[in-house]
């Protein structure tokens, strides 16, 4: 993995924009659905999915299209399209308990962008050292049920503040999301991108839907 695994852009949104988006999420709290991690393996959080965003939160969709995507394309060095699964191509995710988060994994799409709206519980995105991401590229899923083994390896932690943007090469960088504090919440806008014209791998898409929603 010779390329940089991620880019952390601080203060991508102004405080006023961040506050406005936070209020918007609260106004639409009735859309949130609890994801418990099917079979104990999938991620745990509350979510507003892409179909709901498209219908009810056009400003969240517009942020991804007009401001996030150009920066992700610059980071990628190539034109990109939205991930092929409309429900998962954009999401609002909220983590409010220590057990909520993502275990170590690789994404089914090459690039993902996280816009932090609130981080009141010391939420982090952690990356395995690049050498270990290379070594474990094809072993990550056999090891998926025992994430504590991967947690013994060297890693880097990124803590984003409100308004920050984190762009990742999620398909090659093994990473996880953790909630470190027992109080507060973390609100993320998540935008997933694929190479222009690329269609998702049907098998990986099926696995993702089984583990997610």
Predicted feature residues:
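Short, solvent-exposed loop/turn segments at secondary-structure junctions
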Residues: 13-15, 118-120, 132, 171-174, ...
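Short beta-strand His + acidic residue motifs that chelate non-heme Fe in jelly-roll/DSBH
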Residues: 173-182
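Conserved double-stranded beta-helix
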Residues: 41-54, 65-125
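Non-heme Fe(II)/2-oxoglutarate
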Residues: 1-75
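Double-stranded beta-helix
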Residues: 191-213
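Fe(II)/2-oxoglutarate
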Residues: 1-3, 135-137, 148, 208-213
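Catalytic core of non-heme Fe(II) oxygenases with the double-stranded beta-helix
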Residues: 94-165, 202
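A short hydrophobic beta-strand segment most commonly corresponding to one strand
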Residues: 115, 167, 183-198
